[in-house]
């Protein structure tokens, strides 16, 4: 993900574009285990939707120069795992070598969107954490999230975007 791709996608119907990467893991406490997906986002991520659904704490602040351990979890995960704002949570990952490794994160906030499938799975974290866990460099991402303006023909926008992205990225 770089400025070249971002400029290719400079279209009047696009509201925002963000690099994102995911990493599957397990949240483990003394009494519970819960499968999650870390959704790594960067400092420019548009938090407006999540902010409007924030029920306690704050949105984490990330920057390009350092890796943050701050995360945002859902109320569903917090309730199931008996976690709260300012708690440390250990998330376990399986590497390519099939070895497990745990990382400790600090819960900065709790959200509740009402979208059960998302709330059951996603923990927002620093994109640099997911890059490190995946062994990626600073330009690598899992996908890009494209938000369209209201009242845009999604099918037409999809067709335009599809032909603007280089084939090696599709």
What are these regions (language model features)?
Residues 2-139:
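A structural signal for hydrophobic secondary-structure junctions
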Residues 2-8, 157-164:
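Short amphipathic alpha-helices in soluble, non-transmembrane regions
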Residues 38, 142-147:
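Short cationic amphipathic helices and targeting signals
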Residues 88, 143-144, 170:
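Conserved active-site beta-strand-loop modules that form the wall/rim of enzyme catalytic pockets
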Residues 107, 144, 161:
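Conserved hydrophobic/aromatic pocket- or pore-lining residues that grip, position, or stack substrates
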Residues 133, 140, 149-152, 157:
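Extended amphipathic alpha-helical scaffolding segments in membrane-proximal extra-membrane regions
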Residues 148-149, 158-170:
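A cross-kingdom feature of multi-pass membrane systems that activates on extracytoplasmic/periplasmic
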